[in-house]
């Protein structure tokens, strides 16, 4: 029977119990379950744990640049409701040709990262803390993995990206005189 389930009674065998008396929320969909907020959060955290274990590339929108109490400058993004921090030295921001070669590297990176706010960035989770639910990631690792995948052919295969091929690019920053693009792991400025 579809609308009953078997329940084992103490010493009396099994008995059919109507679906209407099941514990929990009675849902419209016969086989649906209602998950608590804690269960949903655990499922999302488990997804991050799996991504960390498999080194899967994830994508999030760059939400801010912050200076931590320790003095570290980090980029902040969110994935599945969890705050992800990326140290500035793991952002792999291309500083060549920005016209400020003599300026402080960190300040240049922060300036460019501020122009990138709101753009989608790829990252790979480097470390997680189960207790505090803190996540540290690397954009650099994701970009290097994408380069390996798209620019270098596997064994005797031809690379997916080659001279003359038309490809899509992700616009990551716009300034009055230049646009920054990310093309499958390679960041370039177009003036």
What does each model-identified segment do?
Residues 1-191:
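Single-stranded RNA-binding regions, centering on S1/OB-family and related RNA-binding modules
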């Amino acid at each position: 029977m579809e609308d009953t389930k078997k329940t084992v009674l103490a010493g009396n065998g099994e008995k059919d119990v109507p679906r209407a008396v099941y514990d929990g929320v009675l849902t419209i969909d016969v086989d649906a379950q209602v998950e608590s907020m804690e269960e949903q959060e655990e499922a999302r955290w488990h997804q991050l744990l799996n991504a960390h274990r498999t080194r899967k590339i994830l994508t999030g929108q760059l939400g801010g640049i912050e200076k931590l109490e320790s003095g570290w400058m980090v980029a902040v993004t969110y994935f599945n409701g969890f705050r992800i921090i990326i140290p500035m030295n793991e952002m792999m921001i291309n500083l060549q040709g920005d016209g400020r070669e003599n300026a402080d590297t960190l300040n240049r990176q922060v300036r460019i990262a501020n122009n990138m706010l709101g753009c989608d960035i790829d990252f790979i989770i480097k470390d997680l803390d189960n207790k505090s639910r803190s996540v540290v990631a690397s954009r650099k690792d994701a970009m290097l993995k994408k380069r390996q995948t798209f620019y270098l052919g596997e064994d005797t295969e031809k690379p997916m990206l080659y001279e003359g091929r038309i490809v899509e690019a992700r616009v990551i920053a716009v300034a009055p005189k230049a646009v920054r693009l990310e093309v499958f792991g390679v960041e370039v400025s177009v003036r």
